[in-house]
């Protein structure tokens, strides 16, 4: 199995570099499989959104497609699946990953009101912290 960096995923998803795309495609077809870390998926979403200006629906489809390949091995697969579902429902992807990775008994605590609202709409345990002592 090989582990892939963000730029390999971006090459496959954007087809933006004709000299690197064939090698990137071969990597995704690696017979022993390929590993994708949460941080790689997080950075890939950011690159597709910030640098390529792709819409959320296209980014979600692209990330889901890569994660759904039969030879893909994902770091904390369940967390990534939850984060992708929450992202599709409107949550920020980084926030969705933070929430998915938070297995605290009393939820994720934040000062971010938008995160609390979006997460609670999805039934996630995210709580607003008070800045008052």
Spans of features found by a protein language model:
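Acidic, PIN/NYN-like endoribonuclease modules and their adjacent C-terminal/linker elements
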Residues: 1, 69, 100, 104-133
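Short, well-structured N-terminal submotif of metal-dependent ribonuclease cores
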Residues: 1-36, 51-61, 122-133
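Short beta-strand scaffold positions
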Residues: 4, 36, 74-75, 93, ...
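Alpha-helix capping/helix-boundary segments
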Residues: 8, 40, 79, 98, ...
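A generic local structural motif
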Residues: 20-22, 94-97
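Alpha-helix C-terminal capping segments
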Residues: 25-31, 83, 87, 98-105
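Acidic catalytic patch
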Residues: 38, 42, 60-88
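Short, amphipathic alpha-helical segments that act as regulatory/interfacial helices
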Residues: 45-48, 103
